[in-house]
Swiss-Prot record:
Leftover remarks: Partially overlaps SWI3.
Recorded topology in the membrane: Multi-pass membrane protein
Cytoplasmic topological intervals: 1-15, 98-119
Residue intervals passing through the bilayer: 16-36, 77-97, 120-140
Cellular-component GO terms for this entry: membrane
The entry's keywords: Membrane, Transmembrane, Transmembrane helix
Descriptive protein name: Putative uncharacterized membrane protein YJL175W
Amino acid sequence: MFLTSPFESCIVLSSLIAGLLFSLSTGFVGILGVFASLFETELSVSPKRLSLSSLSWPKTFWALLSSVEGVSWESSLFACIVGCCFAVTVIASLSASRVFGTVASSFRDSSCCCDSSPAVSVLATPATAALALLSLLLSLPCWSTSTEAFTVDPSPSVFSMLANRITIGL
């Protein structure tokens, strides 16, 4: 409806898909390692840290996160880095889609009076908001909880082996 030429819609949609695939490939290994580390260690919830005053959102979320023990500190730090990389790649790729939409509008037929920038905004703004919110939610547990809430697991985890292989590969 908003995209008047097939060339323009193809460029905008392909740039959005490419940005999504790039951001997912950036965070996929890190998220896998974090979940492997979380499920490999025993998780114990301490009811003493939960109080009746922390029943409102987002206090309940913070209290539940701070009551979880057995999560290694390196997995939380890596999840924070993955969340930041995810947000940066998504925002950069969707900004590139706006540039591609502007370039596509210059190649369009001059007889059409419609501008393509509203169409690109209609497609890019909800996708930017949704993916940036997803990346922020992925990295919130690492930013919100203190390092005292995490206990270091001395046994080598799947995350540690993944991190060592990535470091050796680099």
